[in-house]
Amino acid sequence: MASGCTYDFIVVGSGSSGGVVAGLLQRAGAKCLLIEAGKHFTASTFPANEADYSAQMFWGGGLEYDTRCLMGFLRGKCVGGGSIVNQALQDRFDDIALGDWKAQSGIDYFTPEAMDPFYTAAEDGIVLQTLPAEQRNRSAQLFIRGLDHAEVGWAALRRGQCDCGVEQGNDCIACLGGCHRDSKQSTLIAYIDPAMPKGLDLAAEFLVDRVEHSASGVKVHGHNGSGPKTYEAKKCILAGGSFGTTQILLKSGFRDKLPALGKCFSMHPQYMSFAEFDEPVDAHKGAFQTVKSSDKGLRKKGYKLENVYAPPVSIAMLYRRGGVDLQRFMKRYRYYACVEVAVRDEATGELSIDRKGKLLIKKEITAQDAARRDDGLELVRSVFAAVGAKSMFQSPMYFGLHLMGGCAIGVDPRTSVVNEAFQVHGCENLYTADTSIFPNAPGINPALSVMALAHKLSRQLVKG
């Protein structure tokens, strides 16, 4: 894998988009290079604790912040990207999400029927399990009871996993730093590892600075520990997600040609509330996140509730106090249940860069976002009260895990960055089909839909 070698395809980013695209192109016989800024971990080398994996497997050493330092963003930085550090939840977008995309983008294939073959292909490429009732810990049971009391619908979650061993005493919360059992169906497991022995080249710990497009191909300029390098390919697929792909295009000078570049950023802002109980809840034990709210009324209102938790360091950060107060709070770690409000936010954020190329994130919580948040938090309080919570605490910190937009897809280059064929407008050899192309927030976990889009793009590229 020498600098200057010409590939059929270069894929930048190895998460739910890039990992899938690279694996599928290799299967089709293409000469392909997969570039990833993070390290190449395996089940035996994932960091053993929260402090180490936060520092080593996420951009910003764990968290990135907006320009006002009011909200934090989590973004995986390792081979496999976010698919390594997420909870492997796999949901299709509904007709509401796809209908809104179709209306804003002007693209006809954003319907459940047209996307079905690509969703099916994505689902067939991994092992899926719907979590059974016997794997619900006490936190999930309390959540269900509270939702039932509030007459809010709920459903079991479906995850990409094959052998978590919960019945043997394994705790899935550890997989937020990578799955040590290779059960989680990350792109590393499902696509990248199988493709590498068959010819897929991998350049890990390589940071792309800019891309240079021409009619004959694309040059990818970047650097690693050995210094600057340039790779060349006939075609390049940017798959760095909302932040990564947008930043590369901004640093490559595309903003002058594409005024929509950096616009339409959204992130499903998430607000975590805790309830203390007299008896241990042990929300960190067993299967992590087994049920969700599934309610047409909440969908219409623009938010959902999720039964989540976090490891100790993250919980301490969410408390946002120190000294004796923090010690007292953390001593009760086993006694808390947590419910999160995830808002389907307006795509009003903007991504830009400073003179040194550093990413700048501007995101306001709009009046509509705030109204949805407040309605959700009020519902959470009633859910906790219904199941006998001793006290309640809402974290003042909020954050985004689903980073979307910046390179919106659409038919009009004045209001979008990527066309219906996933090409950057005016660049026939430069593509993207990751979360950066989302024209607005779907209000649903994006992982499976990104994989479906990756399958659609891959079929198109293979056909030529």
Regions found by a protein language model. Give the residues of each.
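A glycine-rich dinucleotide-binding beta-alpha-beta segment and adjacent secondary-structure elements
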Residues: 157, 171-177, 210, 360, ...
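Short hydrophobic beta-strand that contains or immediately precedes a catalytic carboxylate
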Residues: 34-35, 202-203, 432-433
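N-terminal glycine-rich phosphate/pyrophosphate-binding loop and immediately adjacent elements
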Residues: 1-101, 112-113, 222, 257-276, ...
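Dinucleotide-binding Rossmann-like beta1-alpha1 core, especially the glycine-rich loop
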Residues: 56-58, 69-112, 123, 129-153, ...
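Conserved redox-cofactor binding core of oxidoreductases
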Residues: 108-208, 398, 402, 406-408
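A conserved FAD-binding loop/helix module that cradles the flavin
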Residues: 440-459
